[in-house]
Amino acid sequence: MKEDILLKKRLLELHYKNKEEHVGSCFSGLHIIDKIHSSMEENDIFILSCGHLGYALYAVIEKYYGIDAQMLVDKHGGHPHLDEKNKIFCSSGSLGLAITVAVGRAVADPAKTVHVLISDGESAEGTVWESLRFIYEHNIRNIKVHVNMNGVAAYDAVDVPYLVKRLKSFLPDIIIHNTTVSHFPFLRGINAHYHIMSKEDYELGLKELSNEC
């Protein structure tokens, strides 16, 4: 529990210090990325397809590998670039593309398990469905596709039950994570994608996280 709070505080700090948006998105996916890394074998790789969660990935990389998250922010900005030395295995940001790289890496090395995280809004991209179809039709067993189902796309809400039904029809063992972008009073709905924290927001967020301890 304490480690979980420290990770959230670090993510909050990174967003505030760097005046970065996508706060709600990053908090919705933080636990997923953390949980995946906690269970990965030494040779496994993680690919973040929804690149706007870059800050969440940096915080988790810092936790597990001791690589400074602020250094990753300075080097990559909000969306990660390929940097295998620092545990970033694919450039992402253009939605729907990194999952195709994940499929390729899984096919290229069956001895490795590839974990890839996509977002619900990202499922508007045709390459997502092509990738899921390919995984299923070719029975690729060493790739795990995770979906951050926070219910909010770039400009509108997501029909979650309908999307889950469609995703599972393409890939029955796809892993759905039901999350939310509304982690603090200043993060609500679509605005949680684009809100940039003020000092008051940051202090309120720290207070709420301290109360969770």
Task: Please place each PLM-identified region on the residue numbering.
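Residues that form generic nucleotide/phosphate-binding pockets
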Residues: R10, L14, V60, G205-E212
